[in-house]
UniProtKB/Swiss-Prot annotation:
Membrane-spanning parts: none
Active site: 223, 285 (nucleophile)
GO cellular component, one term: extracellular region
EC class: hydrolase
Induction of the gene: Expression of the gene is induced inside phagocytic cells and is dependent on the SsrA/SsrB system. Highly expressed in host macrophages and when grown in an acidic environment.
Domain of life of the source: Bacteria
Protein keywords: Host cytoplasm, Hydrolase, Protease, Secreted, Thiol protease, Virulence
Organism lineage: Bacteria, Pseudomonadati, Pseudomonadota, Gammaproteobacteria, Enterobacterales
Compartments where located: Secreted; Host cytoplasm
Protein name: Deubiquitinase SseL
InterPro entries attached to this UniProt entry: ElaD/SseL-like_N, SseL-like_C
Length: 340
C-alpha cells in the first residue's frame, strides 16, 4: 500500500490519509501541487477531486488548478488539456443517475472554475451549450454588436461583452490603486447620437474628479479601445490605444471633442497608438484592453505611451503560436472574474 500510494501520488501513507480529513497538511499539498505542475495525471485527478470541496481548501485547490489551466501559473506544456479532461470526467460522473442530486458535486452544477474547465473540454455541442447555460444564465447584449450567445463561451474569436470586460477590469483595479477604470461604454449612442464618452467624463468630473490615471473603455461600434487620461509634468494627456485598423477621422474627432472636457486644449495632445495586433487574436480588442490595464497598473511612474507602444511593438515580434497562446490564456483569465 505504501509503495502504491507513493508511486501514484508522491505521498506517504499519513499524508495520503490527511487528504480525507478536514485539515490537509501544507506539506502534502505542496507535494501534490509540484507533481501537478509537472503534469502528473494521477495527482491532477486527485486534486480535481479535492477541488470539489466547498470549503477554503476546496476553493484554494480549484484556484490553483485554474491558474495552471489559464496560464497564470506555469506548468507542463499540456497541463491545461490534462486538467480540463480530468474535470470533464468528474462532470460526467456528477451527471449520472446516482450522483446528479448529490450536493457534494455542487461545483459541477453551478457556475464555477471546475465547470468552466469541464465545458472547455466537451466536444459534444449540445452538452457544451448546456454547461454554458449553467455558467452564464440569461445574458443580454448592451449593444447590437455584442456576442453573448452561450454557444460562443469558449470560442477563441468571441467579442467580449461589456459585463465581462467590466468584471475583469474592475477586478484588476482592486489589485492596483494606481488606476481608476470606468464601466465600458459605447462612443456614440445609436439613436440620440450623443457622445457617451463626453457624458461619462462630465459625470465623473462632477462626482469625484479625474484620478491621475483614469481609464475609459470605449466601443466604437464593433471594436473596443482604451482611452487613458493621465498627468505628465503636471499636464493632462490623453492616450488612445487601438489594436486594430486605424480609426476613421469622424471617430477620432468625437474622441478629441470628449477629451476637451478633461482639460485637453490641443488636438495634438491626444496620442493615438494604433497597430493591428489582432491577426492571430481575432476579435481580441477587449483582451488587449484588459492586458494593457495590467501593464499600466505595474508601470509605476513610467510614461504610459512608452509602456503601451513598447508592448505593441514587442507583441508583433511574437510567433503565431505565441500570439495564439496569448489569445487562449487571456480569454480564460478574463472569464475567471465572471465566475467569482
Amino acid at each position: 500500500m505504501n509503495i502504491c500510494v507513493n508511486s501514484l501520488y508522491r505521498l506517504s501513507i499519513p499524508q495520503f490519509h490527511s487528504l480525507y480529513t478536514e485539515e490537509v497538511s501544507d506539506e502534502a499539498l505542496t507535494l501534490l501541487f509540484s507533481a501537478v505542475e509537472n503534469g502528473d495525471q494521477n495527482c491532477i485527478d486527485l486534486l480535481c477531486n479535492l477541488a470539489l470541496r466547498n470549503d477554503d481548501l476546496g476553493h484554494r485547490v480549484e484556484k490553483f488548478l485554474f491558474d495552471l489551466f489559464s496560464g497564470k501559473r506555469t506548468g507542463s506544456s499540456d497541463i491545461d488539456k490534462k486538467i480540463n479532461q480530468a474535470c470533464l470526467v468528474l462532470h460526467q460522473i456528477a451527471n449520472n443517475d446516482i450522483t446528479k442530486d448529490n450536493t457534494e458535486w455542487k461545483k459541477l452544477h453551478a457556475p464555477s472554475r471546475l465547470l468552466y474547465m469541464a465545458g472547455s473540454a466537451t466536444t459534444d455541442l449540445s452538452k457544451k451549450i448546456g454547461i454554458a447555460h449553467k455558467i452564464m444564465g440569461d445574458q443580454f447584449a448592451q449593444t447590437d454588436q455584442e456576442q453573448v450567445g452561450v454557444e460562443n463561451l469558449w470560442c477563441g474569436a468571441r467579442m467580449l461583452s461589456s459585463d465581462e470586460l467590466a468584471a475583469a477590469t474592475q477586478g484588476l483595479v482592486q489589485e492596483s490603486p494606481l488606476l481608476s477604470v470606468n464601466y465600458p461604454i459605447g462612443l456614440i449612442h445609436p439613436t440620440t447620437k450623443e457622445n457617451i464618452l463626453s457624458t461619462q467624463l462630465l459625470e465623473k468630473i462632477a462626482q469625484s474628479g479625474l484620478s491621475h490615471n483614469e481609464v475609459f473603455l470605449v466601443n466604437t461600434g464593433d471594436h473596443w479601445l482604451l482611452c487613458l487620461f493621465y498627468k505628465l509634468a503636471e499636464k493632462i494627456k490623453c492616450l488612445i490605444f487601438n489594436t486594430y485598423y486605424d480609426l476613421n477621422e469622424n471617430t477620432k474627432q468625437e474622441i478629441i471633442e470628449a477629451a476637451k472636457i478633461a482639460g485637453i486644449s490641443e488636438s495634438d495632445e491626444v496620442n493615438f497608438i494604433e497597430m493591428n495586433l489582432q491577426n492571430n487574436v481575432p476579435n481580441g480588442c477587449g483582451l488587449f484592453c484588459y492586458h494593457t490595464i495590467q501593464l499600466l497598473s505595474n508601470a509605476g511612474q513610467n510614461d504610459p505611451a512608452t509602456t503601451l507602444r513598447e508592448f505593441a511593438e514587442n507583441f508583433l515580434t511574437l510567433s503565431v503560436e505565441e500570439q495564439a497562446l496569448f489569445n487562449t490564456q487571456t480569454r480564460r483569465q478574463i472569464y475567471e472574474y465572471s465566475l467569482q
